[in-house]
């Protein structure tokens, strides 16, 4: 297999890796054909503009939250243990209140007709600043009595956690039975987070998981297309007894959890209704309406749900809800990238450094693929040894392509060379490369993870381009170990391709470039050893098999 085929395969791998989502977009879930009167009323309620916030600030060891005292919305959430993508001196802000972008969590109580019973009422809190004391901090917002109902909204933040419990405490003194439902929403605009680029682009938008429909992405563009097609609002509605829904972006997520791992579903009183749509104000929302059991006069009740708003740390989210780890966006190769990351994580637990874990993983992958790559490289080595004879055939027959081809095929037979012997092994390595790309690119565990020296964040590009330059050098070295091409154009390609690949890798995460560099070094060692072995066999007059 010559270098032209080799680079072609790697180019195919990169094209597939970068363009897969565009070539094979996620199918749209089937929308419900019609809304009920209650659904339309909920939609009208959701269209209310985001009012300016009266801030209540909550600070724990993991987050700083800003809650609007009037509406009770969670309008800003700063993740204190993560740095901003564009400025490492600032913490990462997940939720935004509309100054830079809009991304908030809202919750309401609805009557039987779908009307927000707290609309225009407003909450109040005993103080404006809360901080963690002990394992938990509770923020209680109280609303004036309305319709004979006394309602409190309670946020509970837990030490060391990104789970926020949102609870309504309801006391019915209305003189009649109250039939209510709780509506929970995550609302955001379509702006992309910092750090998104052509080579480092990940999905941003709504996601939903239900046992009936499994995991689905409902992209902003899908919702926009439906809105442009003539619908006043694009909606995806379904009923479910359990699941989760929310928004994801690169490394982070926010999801309402309908059933905690090993716990009871919040939909115990009846199926919950999930609704994903583009609103009239051009904001996008994922919401779930949870029916409550009837509250008799004089009785008390509560509606409680967990919101996970934080990093997509596999070991954490896998224990929060069933299949929540699917929100970690490995693209179309989740089935392959997920076990690769599992192995990488196990190595990290032993070694304690993600960079060295990547190096050890590269060695393991190389060892597993050795039988395949060895056959490929032996084929290339035999082609390299036969290169002078191939050049002589080309010079002898000149433009007589038919005679030239026949002579070359006879040479391949005499030398026991299979010109396509290296193709299949290289093709089988493409899924490995794509899987590793997504395993390294999508994993928040590598965010801000140092290796050594100048590499302080394996999830970002090498700031000094040292690794891409080393990678280019290793690719140039490989060209001298491969069969020299007889075509002058191919010879030029051999010199240009390492430069092209290194420029592309300037923008790739340092962790991925590190993998590629180590893989190249191992390949050089393997190819050099095979070349020397075959040359020695030929020098001794042995038949090379």
Curated annotation (Swiss-Prot):
Q: Where in the cell is it found?
A: Cell inner membrane
Q: Does the keyword Transmembrane apply?
A: yes
Tell me the Gene Ontology biological-process terms attached to this UniProt entry: protein insertion into membrane; protein transport
Q: Which Gene3D superfamilies match?
A: 2.70.98.90
Q: How does it sit in the membrane?
A: Multi-pass membrane protein
Q: Which residues cross the membrane?
A: 350-370, 424-444, 461-481, 498-518
Q: Cellular component terms, GO, for this chain's entry?
A: plasma membrane
Keyword Thylakoid included in the entry's annotation:
no
Q: Which domain of life is it from?
A: Bacteria
User: Which InterPro entries does this chain map to?
Assistant: Membr_insert_YidC, Membr_insert_YidC_N, YidC/ALB3/OXA1/COX18, YidC/Oxa/ALB_C, YidC_ALB_C, YidC_periplasmic_sf
Query: What is the first-listed, main subcellular location in coarse terms?
Result: membrane
Which keywords fit this entry according to its UniProt record? Cell inner membrane, Cell membrane, Chaperone, Membrane, Protein transport, Transmembrane, Transmembrane helix, Transport
> What are this entry's molecular-function GO terms?
membrane insertase activity
Please describe the quaternary structure of this protein. Interacts with the Sec translocase complex via SecD. Specifically interacts with transmembrane segments of nascent integral membrane proteins during membrane integration.
Instruction: Check the record and name the PANTHER family matching this protein.
Output: CYTOCHROME C OXIDASE ASSEMBLY PROTEIN COX18, MITOCHONDRIAL (PTHR12428:SF65), OXA1 (PTHR12428)
Similarity annotation: Belongs to the OXA1/ALB3/YidC family. Type 1 subfamily.
Free-text function comment from the UniProt entry: Required for the insertion and/or proper folding and/or complex formation of integral membrane proteins into the membrane. Involved in integration of membrane proteins that insert both dependently and independently of the Sec translocase complex, as well as at least some lipoproteins. Aids folding of multispanning membrane proteins.
Q: What is this protein called?
A: Membrane protein insertase YidC
Lineage of source species: Bacteria, Pseudomonadati, Pseudomonadota, Betaproteobacteria, Neisseriales
